[in-house]
Design a protein with these regions (language model features):
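Conserved PLP-enzyme active-site core in the AAT-like
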Residues: 11-300, 304-313, 317-332, 340-350
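N-terminal amphipathic/basic-hydrophobic helices that include classical n-h-c signal peptides
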Residues: 1-13
């Protein structure tokens, strides 16, 4: 007699919870519609009306005179450094700065410059140490620029308070040095501080903001600057291969990222806090003082090994310098953080 096959419940595929970065966000339906309907022209000729609107909007929101839409945050930062530095000059930056850790030698290649790092607990440099790091001797690389990063990625997504920024800006003014802000996640800082992005951008010569992280656009950053620097920045963008022709299809998403994206960041921050507290309850080494925006770092015994095991249970994260980084973002559901904690706990129990 033929055996009947027992009923088998069809298992749903495991949902992947992607905590590697807020760059993994996908454009919303509204963004896709705006992109499809965007009015375009040739942006290399400054004839794309949607790009022009994005640049003007970013400048208005940040309180600077002019903006330049570029493909990436690295390009935005590097154009700023090219604007400010002469070859052989030095940038003073906080330890762990993105321009030092994650922009692979671009400063040396493009500007012929070097970086001097100063101590920056929680991403906040001591203005006295910044002042002491300024070089004027012919025996040393002369200082050409001071740079800050807000929020500070490597410090844990920490926020540089307004008064700390003002103190370093004062050092720059007294030394007649320009000052650049890497504000890739500046809107996260503004939400965390209950401030405006314009207030945090005030006093900087140039500011870089990223549209494709927590704000949710698929591509792009904007470099904000005085009008007097805009033509030279435009030339540098062309030199670096950043002219994108009918870029209005991308700028349309960027406009929505700027107008709608900041409203969702507080939720990202709350998810990160919930995640961090849950990890601490699991006995993991989490410095809760650093969990100020949408990032959580912790230091396990084997970061790379743990990241690989978590990937097997559908939790994606990055191992960076012996630490695990988890980043919350708009594409996560309300159930994803509790579920991620359950999966992390199951992996820890097995090891």
């Amino acid at each position: 007699m033929r055996r009947t096959t027992p009923f088998r419940r069809k298992l749903r595929p495991m949902r992947v919870i992607d905590l590697r970065s807020d760059t993994v966000t996908k454009p919303t339906p509204a963004m896709r519609k705006a992109m499809a309907e965007a009015e375009v022209g040739d942006d290399v000729y400054s004839e794309d009306p949607t790009v022009n609107r994005l640049e003007a909007l970013a400048a208005e929101i940040l309180g600077l005179e002019a903006g330049l839409f570029v493909p990436s945050g690295v390009m935005s930062n590097q154009i700023a450094l090219m604007l400010h530095l002469r070859r052989g000059y030095e940038v003073i930056a906080p330890e762990g700065a993105h321009i030092y850790e994650y922009e692979p030698g671009s400063l040396a290649v493009l500007s012929g410059g070097t970086i001097r790092l100063v101590r920056a607990p929680y991403g906040i440099p001591d203005p006295a140490e910044v002042k002491a790091a300024i070089h004027t001797s012919i025996h040393q690389a002369p200082t050409g620029l001071i740079e800050l990063e807000n929020t500070h990625n490597a410090a844990g997504g920490t926020v540089v308070p307004l008064e700390a920024q003002r103190a370093v800006q004062q050092v720059a003014r007294e030394a007649s040095l320009p000052i650049h802000l890497d504000g890739a996640r500046l809107f996260n800082a503004a939400v965390a501080l209950g401030s405006s992005a314009a207030e945090l951008a005030r006093g900087f010569d140039t500011v870089s903001i990223c549209l494709s992280k927590g704000l949710g656009a698929p591509v792009g950053s904007v470099l904000l600057m005085p009008k007097a620097l805009r033509a030279e920045a435009w030339r540098y963008r062309k030199l670096l291969g950043g002219g994108m022709r009918q870029a209005g299809v991308l700028a349309a998403a960027g406009i929505l990222a700027l107008t709608e994206g900041p409203k969702l960041l507080a939720r990202d921050h709350q998810m990160a806090r919930t995640l961090a507290e849950g990890l601490a309850r699991l006995g993991l080494e989490v410095d809760l003082k650093t969990v100020q925006t949408n990032m959580v770092y912790f230091r396990p015994k084997d970061a790379s090994g743990l990241a690989a095991r978590l990937a097997q249970v559908g939790v994606l994260c990055n191992a960076l310098g012996g630490r695990i980084r988890l980043v919350t973002h708009r594409d996560l559901s309300d159930e994803d953080i509790p579920e991620a904690l359950r999966r992390i706990e199951s992996v820890l129990v097995e090891t």
